[in-house]
């Protein structure tokens, strides 16, 4: 027990000694650290002082440099402003010198003008004196002339005016004739080039149309079936289609006759289907005719759409499309009107291209120009007026309407588009073989043309040539002068336009010739 107590005291003593030693060591260490920190702080303060001194010196140097730089810039700017002021001063001095010179020049001119005015006033006074003297002399001479010529001055003036007026009229007539001749030559040359180019580029095919249709039969026995009991089938066909069915001695064929090609086409298709079907009686005839009529209407519409597409004319009203398609079954002097309209559209477009005009508009006017022929048998009036009315009604432009209305009337053609349509219409109709007319009508038209020319005084002979498209008139040189011949030509043209109806245009040529003959003995 005692040993443990001793050990415990010893242990406590050792611990106390260790604590004392540790405290002493810690105290000494703290003192060393404090001394080290103080030394470091002193060192930092010294370095900071040195750095502050360096910064201060640098700041002073920088400030001095900036001051020097600002001083240099100020001196430079001052020198530049001084140079500008010197230049401005020189310009001002130069302007002052110029102004002084101009003032001196103006003063000299004013002096010269004053001198000139004085001279002019002096000359004016001299001229007035001479004018008065001349007036007195003219009056004296005038009195002497009136006494010698036994005529007053007013009468002499009237005679002189009449003479000058007659001479002026002669000169004016000669000038007008020369201008017209030059214009006609140039216009004829240019129009021939354009027309020749258009015709060379477009040559449409054409087959003459007939006013009858022939339906072939498988045998002659079919004629009896077509006639029917007591002719009832023929009467039913004629009543349903509006055509004349002719059954004659022609073997294995019957003839359909009608002035209306659409009716004739309906009758032809209907009869062919009846022959193929074999059932020919009034009830069946009516059914077939109704179906065929609807099919023909559809064909007309398709034809109009196809033609407008082929020609390149779009956005046409459906009613005008139907009228255009129906022209397939119309003829004019045996020429198919639809093919004629296509020809006119192409020719008009080509001539418009040569003249730098709107090609689409020209083709449109050419294609629709004869649209009135589709309904002219139903409505009173000329086909041109009817066509223009329909075109206006269904939304065509005013230029198109005018071209349609005036394509057969020179007097109303006041637009270049109308002239082109008229020229293309004449070209298409005037081609050899394009149209045919009855000999009696042809001869009558030529006689009327020659009678109009012979009705004027001074006409010796006249000849209608080129199928009535030109008339040549011979006049005597002793009866008419050149100016009278020109006026005669214009009068004949006006009378032909007012009294005759003709396609295209008629050229009137007046020939005045002088013949001199003598005999060698």
Curated annotation (Swiss-Prot):
SMART domains: HDc, KH. This is Ribonuclease Y. It is a single-pass membrane protein. One of its GO terms (biological process) is mRNA catabolic process. Residues 337-430 form the HD domain. Endoribonuclease that initiates mRNA decay. Residues 211-277 form the KH domain. The gene is rny. Keywords: Cell membrane, Endonuclease, Hydrolase, Membrane, Nuclease, RNA-binding, Transmembrane, Transmembrane helix. Belongs to the RNase Y family. Its EC number is 3.1.-.-.
């Amino acid at each position: 027990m005692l040993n443990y107590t001793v050990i415990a005291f010893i242990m406590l003593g050792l611990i106390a000694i260790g604590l004392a030693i540790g405290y002493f060591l810690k105290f000494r260490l703290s003192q060393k650290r404090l001394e080290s920190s103080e030394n470091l702080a002193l060192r930092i303060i010294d370095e900071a002082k040195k750095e502050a001194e360096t910064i201060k010196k640098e700041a002073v140097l920088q400030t001095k440099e900036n001051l020097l730089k600002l001083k240099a810039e100020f001196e430079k700017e001052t020198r530049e402003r001084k140079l500008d002021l010197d230049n401005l001063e020189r310009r001002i001095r130069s302007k002052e010198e110029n102004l002084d010179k101009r003032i001196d020049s103006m003063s000299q001119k004013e002096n010269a003008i004053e001198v000139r005015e004085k001279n002019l006033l002096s000359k004016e006074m001299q001229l007035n004196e001479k004018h008065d003297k001349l007036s007195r002399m003219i009056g004296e001479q005038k009195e002497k002339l009136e006494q010698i010529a036994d005529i007053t001055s007013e009468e002499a003036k009237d005679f002189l005016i009449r003479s000058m007026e007659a001479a002026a009229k002669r000169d004016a007539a000669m000038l007008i004739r020369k201008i017209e001749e030059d214009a006609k030559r140039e216009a004829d040359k240019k129009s021939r080039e354009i027309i020749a180019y258009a015709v060379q580029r477009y040559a449409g095919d054409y087959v003459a149309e007939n006013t009858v249709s022939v339906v072939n039969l498988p045998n002659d026995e079919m004629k009896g079936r077509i006639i029917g009991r007591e002719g009832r089938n023929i009467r039913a066909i004629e009543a349903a289609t509006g055509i004349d069915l002719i059954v004659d001695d022609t073997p294995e064929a019957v003839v359909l006759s009608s002035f209306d090609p659409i009716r004739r086409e309906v009758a032809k298709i209907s009869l062919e289907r009846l022959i193929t079907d074999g059932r020919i009686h009034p009830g069946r005839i009516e059914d077939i005719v109704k179906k065929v009529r609807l099919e023909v209407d559809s064909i007309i519409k398709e034809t109009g759409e196809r033609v407008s597409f082929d020609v390149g004319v779009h956005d046409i009203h459906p009613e005008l499309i139907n009228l255009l398609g129906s022209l397939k079954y119309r003829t004019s002097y045996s020429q198919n009107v639809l093919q004629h309209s296509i020809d006119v559209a192409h020719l008009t477009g080509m001539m418009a291209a040569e003249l730098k005009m709107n090609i689409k508009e020209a083709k449109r006017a050419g294609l629709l120009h004869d649209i009135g022929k589709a309904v002219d048998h139903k409505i009173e009036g000329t086909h041109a007026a009817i066509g223009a009315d329909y075109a206006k009604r269904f939304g065509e432009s005013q230029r198109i309407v005018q071209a349609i209305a005036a394509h057969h009337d020179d007097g109303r053609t006041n637009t270049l588009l109308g002239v082109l349509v008229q020229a293309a219409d004449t070209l298409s109709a005037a081609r050899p073989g394009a149209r045919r007319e009855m000999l009696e009508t042809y001869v009558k038209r030529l006689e009327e043309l020659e009678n109009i020319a012979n009705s004027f005084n001074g006409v010796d002979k006249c000849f209608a040539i080129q199928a009535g498209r030109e008339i040549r008139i011979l006049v005597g040189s002793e009866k008419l002068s050149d100016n009278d011949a020109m006026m005669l030509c214009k009068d004949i043209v006006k009378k032909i336009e007012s009294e005759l109806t003709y396609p295209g245009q008629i050229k009137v040529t007046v020939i005045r010739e002088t013949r001199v003959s003598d005999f060698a003995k």
